[in-house]
């Protein structure tokens, strides 16, 4: 597996729906609190002890995508996280927490927030899903409101042609 070494930081508020307005040095707990999902909010300290303040290991074991803290708060910070949750569900075979489903079934509130995200970033997430399993991705998108698919595919979607070998 991959090991990621980063400086711990504490984020300020997110007024643009993408990046924090300010960043300052922080503790490991500050850094883990700003993560999107519990399975991404674990660390190992210098004595090889697992730091898991949001029960990410349990969610990993149960194959569940759950937000650190409030899903609404995490997705307001960066709306692309909604699509990341969908991608992890599709590519990793994880279920989604009820709070995330509530957001997916509230498209009139959440779909407009995708407008702050570049179409390129949206397409990157969708391409990763489609590359993993096209049918499952399309089935998933069909299962949620058409408002989502309209927003996701508003600029169209270019896929590389594929050829089945016989």
Language model segments and positions:
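Catalytic cores of the polymerase beta-like nucleotidyltransferase superfamily
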Residues: 1-166
